[in-house]
């Protein structure tokens, strides 16, 4: 009885969010259990492309031979410009995880676990911000974890899953600016989360910008202190640009100085079907 009381007292001191995070971790391990026990790497349609990217950054970290633009180790050492225009920040983070993991199987298990848990917890925070109870919020997080939005990384090696891991943390501040009585939101939170998303998956940052637009417009119309709201938004945008400045400079530099061939030359009209 004494031991039960001690456990009960300890459990009360642990924050609810930590318990939720722990439960998400257990569910993620259950989802990944077949891969853990079978010890088999899941090779998706995008896996080889990203494996080359991360192997390149991993070897750069390991050897100390860094190259911002060209691929020194990946893509058959072809000197292709990939990571500089494809989310360089996350590429180096993934390369670091690969270096620590030591194998592709461990790398996939670790990254899939992080995508599942972090993404689910982000959606849980949004649900709680919308005043849903803890059980419903947890359920929504579980649904998000098992949806194609995050599972696309686990099963297909698609980087959309990585972007969808970060996306809820940006969208959270759209909810915050609408639900707050004075229409206040965390300037640093919105700016840094968007900056991290820009370093993670550029297309996801475009999607979340579109998703945030209605929140911004409605909040601007309804708020009384419009100038303060616009200034706060300006500071957040500035912070997100500064925290992802390398992304913008890379795109500008390559686009401006590329005189040999277009980055991705495609004649879309040649494969189109015309009806007369």
Predicted regions and their residues:
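Periplasmic/ER-lumenal interhelical loops and adjacent helix-loop junctions
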Residues: 229-232, 237-276
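Short hydrophobic alpha-helices at membrane interfaces in multi-pass membrane enzymes
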Residues: 176-195, 226-234
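Active-site lumenal/periplasmic loops and adjacent helix-entry segments of GT-C-fold
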Residues: 30-130, 135-168, 172-173, 196-197, ...
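Structural signal for the C-terminal ends of transmembrane alpha-helices
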Residues: 30-34, 173-180, 214-225
